[in-house]
Amino acid sequence: MSKVYFTQDHEWLNIEGEIATVGITHYAQEQLGDLVFVDLPQCGTQLSQGDSAAVVESVKAASDVYSPIDGEVVEINEALADDPALVNKKAEKEGWLWKMKLHDKTQLDGLMDEDAYKVLIG
């Protein structure tokens, strides 16, 4: 069974076992506008919580996407190279950015559930 967490920087994580799928929230993509380019981390990259892991560029601005937890990148969403707008269309489904192997599950305790995130974005 998977569980979804959210960060104050508007990333989401879907946890399945030891693997976290990471992306930006629907709210974040709405604020950015139409995405035109996504720069993703390489597989094998070790990330620490808070590291700048990816960049999403829209017609408005370029924004860093931060690693919500410590872990190793094990897969990236190759489809975004040809169609970065997938993030706009389905930010919390097919528009995921990367998958990572968790190093410390206790870090999840500092993240928000969906209800807390909805309060954050008002």
Curated annotation (Swiss-Prot):
Binds 1 lipoyl cofactor covalently. GO terms for biological process: glycine decarboxylation via glycine cleavage system. The keyword Ubl conjugation does not apply. One of its GO terms (cellular component) is cytosol. Gene3D superfamilies: 2.40.50.100. Keywords: Lipoyl. It comes from the Bacteria. The modification N6-lipoyllysine is found at K60. Residues 19-101 form the Lipoyl-binding domain. Pfam families: GCV_H. Its cofactor is (R)-lipoate. The glycine cleavage system catalyzes the degradation of glycine. The H protein shuttles the methylamine group of glycine from the P protein to the T protein. The glycine cleavage system is composed of four proteins: P, T, L and H. Belongs to the GcvH family. This is Glycine cleavage system H protein. It comes from Bartonella bacilliformis (strain ATCC 35685 / KC583 / Herrer 020/F12,63).
